[in-house]
A protein has these predicted regions:
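Short alpha-helical donor nucleotide-sugar binding micro-motif in glycosyltransferases
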Residues: 91, 274, 283-288
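Acidic donor-binding loop of glycosyltransferase active sites
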Residues: 95, 286-300, 313
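A short, active-site helix/loop in glycosyltransferases that binds the activated sugar's phosphate group
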Residues: 145-196
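A conserved mid-protein helix/loop that constitutes part of the nucleotide-sugar donor-binding site
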Residues: 207, 216-230, 254
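Nucleotide-activated donor-binding/catalytic signature segment of Leloir-type glycosyltransferases, i.e.
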Residues: 253-275
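Short hydrophobic beta-strand element within catalytic cores of glycosyltransferases
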Residues: 305, 314-317
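Conserved acidic donor-binding segment of nucleotide-sugar-dependent glycosyltransferases
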Residues: 329-330, 334-341, 350-356
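A short, well-ordered alpha-helix in the C-terminal region of glycosyltransferases
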Residues: 343, 350, 357-371, 380-383
Length: 391
């Protein structure tokens, strides 16, 4: 089977190797294992983006069709005719095109390939859920909302003719009414070799609290920092390790440092920067006592939670989006209230002071995540694709 793949995250080729962001590269390599060939239709990164493209795709079955530079969304749409020519050149060689969604050019690409080759969507979220939280002038936000509505309505309209992979229970419930070919999957960066089994954490202070992901206020990082400060006042010694990337001009890091200064805990909040998925990132999970993500908005299930569970780290999280459909409070995670530093403080303290419950959560978490591996999920996807394209 010759699989095509498109998403808006870029990639580039250098010295005979294809480089992209780690979670995308791991996913592509895992698909390639079950395909004859995989052709990537991906944008070319800007110079600033290249430093994040640290994963070299391993499979020799993967080829890259480099699209235009990763311009802003309006410019990509305006210049789409250039991309159309590249896709048309390759279209007859593909058995199916898989698009991770949402992605800006999905409506245009689908329109061009529909009726010519089969297509599939891997639905990992909904842009409309995040428009209101965008920090833009109202007129800009109105334009963004119009674009998002256009993109999502086209995605839903075309779903009836494609194969849909849904990354959450909510997405599955929605798309199974729109498509006769809908499969629920769990996107992940985990391989079988990545699991780290241990019985317990929080054995000695300072307790290592870990956050991984995009550094933004919507992830609850200001409240998490405040909770660490409150624990400090109660003589509970914690370190907050923040691993991830921050968007240009985003004020979150400076606001975190301001709160840390107010509580006198500047030395207890450590920014480690962006780390690639794999051993570099997983070394932080192995050293962590607790993992926390305090998302304030509805979202899909964060793959960072899967990573924490697989590394035997107790998870503290808000039950937003798909999280409450997968995790159960005080069974395989501990829930906190959104935007509530006091709730965060109390749950961190609860896990530190209750080893029996902590061990139980670790074991239940490992049981929850045991089938969320690239080996299992990618084979499930490829098997579904082969069934879909076989008459």
């Amino acid at each position: 089977m010759h699989l095509g793949f498109h998403y808006h995250l870029p990639a580039f080729e250098e010295n005979g190797k294809i480089y992209t962001i780690a979670f995308q590269g791991l996913f592509i390599d895992s698909l390639a294992e079950y395909c004859d060939q995989v052709t990537l239709f991906l944008f070319t990164p800007t110079q600033a983006e290249r430093k994040e493209m640290q994963y070299a795709i391993r499979s020799k079955k993967v080829k890259l069709v480099s699209l235009m530079k990763h311009y802003n969304i309006p410019l990509r749409i305006l210049l789409y005719p250039t991309i159309r020519k590249q896709i048309k050149t390759m279209i007859n060689t593909l058995d199916i095109l898989l698009m991770r969604a949402p992605t800006p050019l999905l409506p245009l690409i689908t329109k061009d390939i529909k009726g010519k080759i089969p297509f599939a969507y891997l639905v990992v979220g909904e842009m409309s859920l995040h428009v209101d939280s965008i920090k833009q002038q109202e007129w800009r936000k109105s334009l963004i909302r119009q674009y998002v509505n256009w993109n999502e309505s086209n995605q839903e309209k075309h779903a009836k003719d494609g194969l849909i992979f849904a990354n959450s229970s909510a997405a599955f419930e929605k798309y199974k009414t729109l498509s006769n070919n809908c499969v629920q999957v769990k996107t992940t960066t985990l391989r079988n070799e990545d699991f780290y089994i241990r019985e317990d954490t929080c054995l000695n202070p300072p307790y290592q609290i870990l956050f991984t992901g995009r550094i933004e206020q919507e992830k609850g990082l200001l409240e998490i920092t405040e909770a660490i400060g409150k624990l400090h006042k109660e003589s509970i010694d914690c370190r907050l390790n923040i691993v991830g990337w921050i968007l240009p001009k985003d004020p979150t890091e400076s606001l975190i440092r301001k709160i840390a200064s107010e509580y006198g805990i500047e030395d207890k909040i450590i920014f480690h920067g962006f780390k690639s998925a794999g051993e570099e990132l997983f070394s932080f999970y192995k050293a962590a006592d607790l993992f926390i993500v305090a998302s304030q908005n509805n979202e899909g299930f964060p793959r960072t939670i899967w990573e924490a569970l697989a590394n035997s780290v107790p998870v503290i999280c808000t039950p937003v989006g798909s999280i409450s459909q997968v995790l159960t409070n005080e069974h395989n995670a501990v829930f906190i209230e959104p935007k509530n530093s006091e709730s965060i403080k109390e749950k961190i303290k609860f896990l530190i002071q209750n080893p029996t419950k902590r061990k139980e959560i670790i074991q239940n978490g490992l049981e929850t995540v045991k089938e969320v591996t690239l080996e299992i999920q990618s084979k499930k996807m490829v098997d579904a694709i082969k069934s879909f394209i076989t008459p």
